[in-house]
Amino acid sequence: MAGSAAERSVAVPSIREAGCVYSVATRADEPALRELLRANSLGGWIQLAFQREPDAFAGTFGLAHSHDFIIAHEEKSGRAVGLCERFVRDAFVNGEVVRLPYLGSLRVNADFRNRIRILRQGFVAVRDLLGDRRDAGFSLTAITADNDVARRVLCAGVSGFPVYLPVGEMLTFAVRTRRSRVGASVCVAGREDLPAIAELLQRTYREYQFAPVWRGDELERLDATWLVIRDRRRIVACLALWDQSAVKQTVVCGYSRAVAVTRPLYNALAPLIRSPRLPAIGAPLRQIYLSHVAVTGSESHCQFDALMSAGLSIARERGLDVAVIGLAARNPLVEVVRRRWKTREYRSLLNVVQWPGRGQFIADSAGRVPHPEIALM
């Protein structure tokens, strides 16, 4: 079990303020991290808990330069109050490789919500207890668009909070899997193809903003199936089916009243309209990520269509109900998805988070489309 708040503040770097102790989470805090993630779902028309069973620290798949949580405990009782996650990966910013921090999993237990000072001090802990001089001076984060409370609080310019700078909108598509004929142009890649896939990803992702840098040895670590299209043996397009269920789970915790009432009828019609069913409360989504998308040339839309169709068919053969893919609203491939498949669409708002005097994000003049990998966020 984790020690008392007083013991924790001595053992690891920490900040004590207003009855709480904020510290860098250790292995002793790991059960509390998982409980905070289980107990605090994100609102909207569907409430989802993004869980990390069996190990909260495994969520970056060993791919990050650093991966930490700030955890807050009530000093008097030792109860866990909330958490914030920060990890750092190489990404393309203005065409250059930088060590980009990501902030996420901001959770506060219900008994402690609506206390601005807890959030304020949590951000102070992230700023002062985490980081490396080699990291970018700003971070990337996403806020669910229909989470009105989070959007109002975080983006309101509250004294002591970092600045949230809007940099784009992300769309997450949940697509019902279905069997179909896999196009002759698509094939499953082998391990020997991973260096070429990494080269393609680096070459294409450099043109985007906030796109991750992928190297061959990192691709080898993923539990993924790689689909590629070749032109005279050269890989010109790729997509991965990335199953994260052994490490990360998305669990339905509730629906809005209107959706809950109409859910039985909707689910009865879902197969007819080729839309994903809405799972029962408490059930994990049987999903897989369609990630690492790269298409090139004048045939890019056709390449993407063929890769997506093949991915959905393979996912259905594996008994998975839903495939998830994330694209910036400005990405031209969004229209391919909307035209070709019936989907559930979720909006989130990308923000750069920056503290005064710690570095500032300034976009270059290239008008780059954001392309963070939602499977990592």
Residue ranges and their predicted role:
Residues A2-H65, F69-H73, A80, Y102, ...:
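Short amphipathic alpha-helix that is part of the acyltransferase structural core
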Residues A110-F112, R120-L227, A237, D243:
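Contiguous mid-protein beta-loop-alpha structural module that forms a pocket-lining wall or clamp
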Residues A58-T60, F69, V88-N94, R127-D128, ...:
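Catalytic micro-motifs at enzyme active sites that drive phosphoryl/nucleotidyl and oxygen chemistry
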Residues H67-C84, D223-V252:
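Conserved beta-hairpin
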